[in-house]
Amino acid sequence: MKPTLRRKLEALAERHEELERLLSDPKIASDTDRFRTYSRELAQLAPIATTLAEETRTKADLAAAETLRTDPEMRELAEQEIAIAQAHLTTLDEQLQRLLIPQDPRDECNLFLEVRAGTGGDEAAIFAGNLFRMYTRYAERQRWKVEVESDTPGEHGGYKEIIARIVGRGAYSRLKFESGTHRVQRVPATESQGRIHTSAATVAIIPEADEIADISINPADLKIDTFRSSGAGGQHVNKTESAIRITHLPTGVVVESQTERSQHANRDKAMKRLKAQLIESQRSQQATAEAMTRKLQVGSGDRSQRIRTYNFPQGRITDHRVENLTLYDLPNIIEGDLDPLIDRLRQEHQAEELARLSNAP
């Protein structure tokens, strides 16, 4: 481990000890807000303190085993103990480095999934449908709930656009690296000459805003329209203008909801999406500014970035953000087996974050 990372760990361990002292102070215990804040921080630092303590014990075991190695009768046993201790120290070192990576506060959020057909006409819409189905299948494997917010079907299948809310523990942490342009190479069903076409679709993963998220929306900045729903809900949706479309005038962001029976419920859902969109826009602008000073490919979330190619004739899927990340398992991946891809992307992101921490003052 680099000295800079070790110093950060030592500082966090000292902070953990300080928090334990503070929480034992009767004055702090009587202050509900401070006690809650310190308790939360202590809980976040506890894994680091526990792992550091285990590392200290393992180093002591290693030193004892090295002392025994000088005894001819104990040498063989000592060599075994040394090997075990060294392997465990390597594991603990890796764990400590991972624990240094700041947790994304949005990781446990629900999310909005937006899939839109790009270049490629009807084939792009069909591919957008394939992607949405892929994410839906993955959500089913994770026991997450998928709620379609709105959709515009393609003329020959798939979707020109489909927006859904995904509800489940850790949903955003698993899918946040899916934002970007996805490209497909295959022979369309309508292609009589058997030629391979290239089409594209864009994916946006937007974390649902926390109820106490720090963003204010001026009602005067909103244009709210009602219209008759064309979505689910039976004949009722065609009788009343229950669907809601909200335009945020300063940014031009437009959201709508038509899946609920009441206008009030649709307005609440649309406002949640608008809030999430505006917060994500702020975060994206900040991330773009940071990217000007450092190269962080995996976690950029740039929707214009071409992130992945799905080559059906070769059964190949390539993620362009990670060197040599090509899997010849497209049939299973398109059916929702995304973990091999997601795990590699998370590992790459962790490596990038560790490199950034190592170079930080």
Swiss-Prot record:
It is found in: Cytoplasm. InterPro entries: PCRF (IPR005139), Pep_chain_release_fac_I (IPR000352), Pep_chain_release_fac_I_sf (IPR045853), Prokaryotic/Mito_RF (IPR050057), RF-1 (IPR004373). Residues 283-306 are annotated as: Disordered. SMART domains: PCRF. Coiled coil: none annotated. The modification N5-methylglutamine is found at residue 235. GO terms for cellular component: cytoplasm. Keywords: Cytoplasm, Methylation, Protein biosynthesis. It holds the Pfam family RF-1. One of its GO terms (molecular function) is translation release factor activity, codon specific. It comes from the Bacteria. Methylated by PrmC. Methylation increases the termination efficiency of RF1. Peptide chain release factor 1 directs the termination of translation in response to the peptide chain termination codons UAG and UAA. Belongs to the prokaryotic/mitochondrial release factor family. This is Peptide chain release factor 1. It comes from Xylella fastidiosa (strain Temecula1 / ATCC 700964).
